[in-house]
Structures are given as C-alpha cells and as structure tokens.
Amino acid sequence: MDKEKFQQKAVKQTKQKKSTSAEFLMVKEYTDATEGAGNPGFNMSSPELPAHQTPQEKVVRHDMLDHTLATHQQKSRLPASAGPKGVTSVLIVLTLAALLIRPGCPEREPGIPLKRACTASVEDLFGARVGGDAAEDLCTHWVQVTHSFVGEGYERMNSLFFGRLR
C-alpha cells in the first residue's frame, strides 16, 4: 500500500515539474507577443515609438482608483431614498385618483362608504375586463394614498380635480 502511494506521488511530482516548466515557457512567449517583438510600433520600450502613443509611465500615472469601473458604478448609484417627492408625488397620485373615480360619482360624504361612493371604470382606462371588486379595491387604494399625501387639504383638492371632470 505504501509502495503504491509513493509511486503515485513520484508521478505527480514529475507532472508538476513538467507543467511548471511549460508554464514558464508559455509566459515568456506571452510577454514577447504582448510586447510586440516583431512590430516596434507595439513595443512600448522601443525608441521608434510613434508620436501619437504615450509612454507607459503616463498611462500608469493616470490610472487611479477613482477611474475604475467599480468605483464609477458605486458613485453613479442613486441613494435608496431617491424618487419623486413633495408636490410631484401629490400631483401624480391625485391625477391617478382622478382618473380612477368616475365623473358621475357623488361627492364623498363622511357617512357614505368609500366603495359605494367611488367605483372605477378600469375597463375604459386599461382596456381589460376586471371585476367590480378589483376596480373598487384599486380605487380605494388610490384614495387612501391621496389622503396620506394631502391630509387636511384633501377636500379642497378633491373639489379642484373632480369638479373639472364633470
């Protein structure tokens, strides 16, 4: 058993020696190819360097951490809180709520349930057949969002938007 292990190790060591020498030769060939041994225009250390090419020192000097792709991607990411805020959000939400509430709906009184007072015409807006409950839920959601954005001034905004629809 020990003899077999010893032979296997010996075979592995000879393979490793061959592969390292082969890798050394491949690296040498690669550096010759990249340096452009046959073409002085591609050889950076050549005295026949064309005028439009810059020496390698200048290229390395300008290669700073800020110019890497990863740093650029990190800087270009928006903060987590980015998005429409303030008046823009209020106007978007109110416009969508105005579209979802049918112009013929009566003004919502405090005693009237929300689902009975506002029924959305989703078929007209999106061209899809949606049941009454889904339309009412959608309308309810947008009215609640509008209430959360506008707060106390909702009734004034309600008459401003929905008064024009009639």
Swiss-Prot record:
Q: Which InterPro entries match?
A: OFCC1
Highest taxon, organism lineage: Eukaryota
Q: Name one GO cellular component term.
A: cytoplasm
One Pfam family of this chain:
OFCC1
Q: Where is this region: Disordered?
A: 1-22
- According to UniProt, the name of this protein is Orofacial cleft 1 candidate gene 1 protein homolog
UniProt gene name: Ofcc1
